[in-house]
């Protein structure tokens, strides 16, 4: 996985053999605490959804990385966007440490997640070297909706706000979560903070939010 600064990615993985990865309420919270520790220094989280056997994150890689990140070689081509290799390692650390905790809890051994975490780079980017004419707004919006629709599409809830393990409740003003950079998401997705809930369903009704470009 290569992650480039200021680009937006859909990151997702599921349980090995589609098995459960979250067994109780505390597991979900523990995983999010791990995400905050391992990933948040390197990326802005725009949306997330944790499902019983898989997870989704919509993120934008930060332009300025922590000083602890080893600098890349100084020689580079003009306009070249350099990847941030530490992020893939941090995702590995997140999943490995979570697996160890769950294996201990469930008295099990072996892998919990599928071997390869997928990271789909969307066409939208605020980076100045992004291809001209590719705003990717529809893909970002599609992914935002796709992630929040997971509990509905799998029959767990009838409304997105009923699933407490996603960021939708934060955007809908039903919870004061701080994991997502909501202001950045409003800017990228052209949402208005005060009327998010109404705008969400207007946009949802107007488009197809399972576009293959975001998954």
Where are these regions (language model features)?
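Short Pro-Cys-Gly-centered "Cys-loop" motif that presents a nucleophilic cysteine in a tight turn
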Residues: 1-47, 51, 61-215
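Structural motif
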Residues: 54-56
